[in-house]
Amino acid sequence: MTAQPEIHLMAGGQDWDEIVTAAGQATDERIVVNMGPQHPSTHGVLRLILEIEGETVTDVRCGIGYLHTGIEKNLEYRTWTQGVTFVTRMDYLSPFFNETAYCLGVEQLLGIADEIPERANVIRVLMMELNRISSHLVALATGGMELGAMTAMFLGFREREMILKVFEAITGLRMNHAYVRPGGLAQDLPDGAEQEVRDLLEILPGRLRDMENLLNENYIWKARTQGVGYLDLTGCMALGITGPVLRATGLAHDLRRAQPYCGYENYDFDVVTHQDCDSYGRYLIRVKEMHESIKIAQQCVDRLRPGPVMVDDKKIAWPADLASGPDGLGNSPKHIAKIMGTSMEGLIHHFKLVTEGVRVPAGQVYVAIESPRGELGVHMVSDGGTRPYRVHFRDPSFTNLQSVAAMCEGAMVADLIAAVASIDPVMGGVDR
């Protein structure tokens, strides 16, 4: 008779049957909850699909697409210049960055990147840095509101209102400006705008210090943000995360310094970093970046010199020595009197630009700039016609949302709110 071998089950002192039974019972206690898409703490129509066990998040996934606008597809049916009015509406909190990235790509395809007037580049940088401040103010205001710091919300929107008034004085609109155009700008700064910017830059530093005094050493604020939403450099590199989330890991990566555009290499500013990899570090980075943006904006105002704001090429833009109307369609009285009354050549160019548009040589290009949320890239393809063959945007909010699971799985539900706020996603850019 053959002896039967003895089987010994060892699993940390427990029998496998007991482990399987315990695992099955634990799963029964987990529930799936939808946070959003209509929720005040998801920064727009973001849907977070949570699997929770008690108050602990065991799994989280992002559901997007609720704000899809088809902007990239629409660009294929509009002229290269008309495209500006579409891209400015993607990340609606930082429209100047959308416009500038798009126009830099068109200018590279046209081969006129080195011909942009100095004054136009200075004004572009000025508007982008003011826009960076206004965007960060919204991030801090909404993030504070979601964690119960209502005073931070009031302060943030109060300061942002001053910046939007300057935008309105310069472009005619508080948002969706379509002010940056291929070849330069839609129009020059109006009379008195330079002084308005100087007055704004005198007020902002003190107002920002008020917010810092309120939050930097606030016990509750630090308790809700320190150690929350942790994501180290390895995680950021694996997921392609950029912007304040990446710089909060200690890596000084900023495209304004790494790959300068619009003359950023001529400005004095510091790339702000932090070492803690958490929500509190991202808050500190945004606050300090606003001070650096003020420094850059002050340099811009000092650099302003009289000159054109559009390339002097009648096949690309309205004649640089003539003013265009607020809508950029060249309908100022001076312009109309010139092209309709005395210049047959001007009338021909005007007719071709309006009815057909600019012909962009065939080719493709990728351009990236540093938006308030990270690397905003645009890959555009031209087939040699008057409309893009394809334009694709690499929006930082879309990429950065990938980090939600890495930041929040294993954390508390309350910490999820702080983590998403520290990413600062804008769904217009995610879905576009």
Curated annotation (Swiss-Prot):
EC numbers: 7.1.1.-
Keyword NAD applies: yes
Primary subcellular site in the record, as a coarse category: membrane
One cellular-component annotation, GO: plasma membrane
One annotated GO molecular function: NAD binding
Transmembrane region(s): none
Keywords of this entry: Cell membrane, Membrane, NAD, Quinone, Translocase, Transport
Pfam families: Complex1_49kDa
Topology class, membrane: Peripheral membrane protein
UniProt-listed PANTHER family: NADH DEHYDROGENASE [UBIQUINONE] IRON-SULFUR PROTEIN 2, MITOCHONDRIAL, NADH-UBIQUINONE OXIDOREDUCTASE 49 KDA SUBUNIT
Family, similarity comment: Belongs to the complex I 49 kDa subunit family.
Task performed by this protein: NDH-1 shuttles electrons from NADH, via FMN and iron-sulfur (Fe-S) centers, to quinones in the respiratory chain. The immediate electron acceptor for the enzyme in this species is believed to be a menaquinone. Couples the redox reaction to proton translocation (for every two electrons transferred, four hydrogen ions are translocated across the cytoplasmic membrane), and thus conserves the redox energy in a proton gradient.
UniProt subunit comment: NDH-1 is composed of 14 different subunits. Subunits NuoB, C, D, E, F, and G constitute the peripheral sector of the complex.
Name listed for the protein in its UniProt record: NADH-quinone oxidoreductase subunit D
